[in-house]
């Protein structure tokens, strides 16, 4: 009798592991930047003398601009090397997060959250496109699972650490912490990740 055996799980190469870690860390920083705003609300409102509605608008500004960004980039994202696209949006996210930490007025805060949302809101979809390009079908489920660990870690580890830092050095300090980590990740992506441009070799469909 022929016995059917389940296919063995293919192992990740060292380069694939590096890519997974980098994408998970981008997920960690982007999600933490969004999630940390609400816990910082009390400190931020007292420091900047904001009303609850003003603070709510600052939180919503990120989500709104992220949605707009997703619509705007849908038409051209596939025309570029995904690594370059990730670096572009991630450096914009870093700049917006740094702006959040340096803000001294409500107008600056709203502007910073809009900038952060415009760039950060696309990073997740770019990361998923990279996964689709670099990993075979049988590995993608595991890769996405590892990437989602970045989401969970941002809540389980990132928020408590951020609140501790905020209570010690001020509400701006978590944003600076995110910037430092994100800059390190950006540099590693820049120097270690290979171009992700296989999709550019596929000719566009002709009507």
Task: Give a label for each model feature.
Residues 18-52:
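Extracytoplasmic
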Residues 146-190:
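Helix-loop-helix hairpin linking two adjacent transmembrane segments in secondary transporters
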Residues 35, 63-71, 155-156:
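Residue-level signature of mid-helix packing/kink "hotspots" within the transmembrane helices
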Residues 191-207:
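Flexible cytoplasmic inter-helical loops of multi-pass small-molecule transporters
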Residues 43, 71-75, 164:
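Membrane-interface helix termini in secondary transporters
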Residues 68-104:
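Conserved MFS/SLC helix-loop-helix module at the cytosolic interface between two early adjacent transmembrane helices
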Residues 96, 107-115:
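Paired small-residue
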Residues 112-150:
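Cytoplasmic helix-loop-helix junction between adjacent transmembrane helices
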